Amino acid sequence: MAPAVQQQQSGGGGGSTGAAAVGSTTRWCPTPEQLMMLEEMYRGGLRTPNAAQIQQITAHLSTYGRIEGKNVFYWFQNHKARDRQKLRRRLCISHHLLSCAHYYHHHLAAAAAVVPPPQLLPPLHPSSSSSSCGGGLIDHANSLLSPTSATTPTSAAAAAAAAAYTTSYYYPFTAAAAPPPPRTSPAASPLFHYNQGGGGVVLPAAEAIGRSSSSSDYSLGKLVDNFGVALEETFPAQPQQPATTMAMTAVVDTTAVAAAAGGFCRPLKTLDLFPGGLKEEQHDVV
């Protein structure tokens, strides 16, 4: 029986040793005082304590709770790893932001280099057509108002019509035509109508007077043959003289004055020009 009791006692001692071993492997739960002191040492610059420092720290912190040397060693290792992860995360975020900013900056710079600024773009077609139309109208108005525009066909026709109204001879079949056109500028030289071969021609006053003085086409007989035109001087209207001082020298002058006063012209008859011609012919026949 003695050996059996010894075995039981030895078995009981082994069980107690196993229980102590299990209890010693429990996880370390630091107290707030221990954590505060460890963080103060870490902020002070201690990162990897040696064996002597670990024993001193363990002896100092054991007064606030259960702690071992390995607990102090692992705490410093884990704290450094957490700081490295935080730093790496911050570096990754900052690098990502910098890369995005660089990408957008490069993209915008390339777009600005490819696309020209708005002021360098050519004008649109509607604006160009409107500007060309406006310019054409302005040029046309300037050509009508300029003194040298009398040489163009349109301006020449307008000047001729104005001259026909103000300073020209009137024909019987065109006396009561359309309303008179506007007057031309005073700088334009006065024009004359004369009948040449049955058609009206507009000439300057000096040239018309020169032709009339040097050619026999403007004789009274020629004018009578060409529709019986009554001449009208192209000078400003003079104040009317008293009837007592006016001398009627020919029937042609009387007819011309009456036609000018009435506003129209009528064909001249042979009897008006030569009232005694018919009587002489009758006398010769008798």
Curated annotation (Swiss-Prot):
GO terms for cellular component: nucleus. CDD domains: homeodomain. This is Putative WUSCHEL-related homeobox 2. Residues 23-87 bind DNA. One of its GO terms (molecular function) is DNA-binding transcription factor activity. It is found in: Nucleus. Its main location: nucleus. Transcription factor which may be involved in developmental processes. It comes from the Eukaryota. SMART domains: HOX (SM00389). The lineage of its organism: Eukaryota, Viridiplantae, Streptophyta, Embryophyta, Tracheophyta.
